[in-house]
Amino acid sequence: QLADIFVRRAEGGAGYVVIDAVTVDHKYWYIGKTTALDKDSLVPQFKKFATRVKDAGSELIPQIIHPGPESICAMKGITPIGPSINTNANGDVSRPATIKEIQKIIKQYGKAARRAEEAGCGGIALHAAHAYMLPGAFLSPLRNKRMDEYGGTIDNRARLILEIIEECRKNVSEDFP
């Protein structure tokens, strides 16, 4: 059903079609049935999706995310993670991500980018806007109260998204946007 919606957008003349909120880790949901690119086994399904969009005259662009503090994962018994302790719109309180977790998430972004390319997507988009999702929350001085290499100065707060971009670039071909 979801694919049909995006194919109709492509048929309507869109140059590219962004499928939003494609998570790098299915344990951290953003919305009810979050689309994910966190397993190699999902590539064939995404390939069919990307092919349908391409056949309709467009390119599929997954917006790769980790919902971080906006995760809806309480029903799974998982505490949302973020740069610092914050309360999300659902009233869930996130805990600060450890350096080890941050490094794992960076790798997950790179793998998701590789999977998107393998599936024939036209590129990827990374969500880091308005203090939302994990990278955006790290950028925000209001949400990021860390005092390590991922907090404090703007250079440190930007470190996560810059490392994510670098990891994505390492995992895809030079001409994959």
Q: Model-derived features: where do they sit?
A:
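Flavin-dependent oxidoreductase catalytic cores
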Residues: 1-177
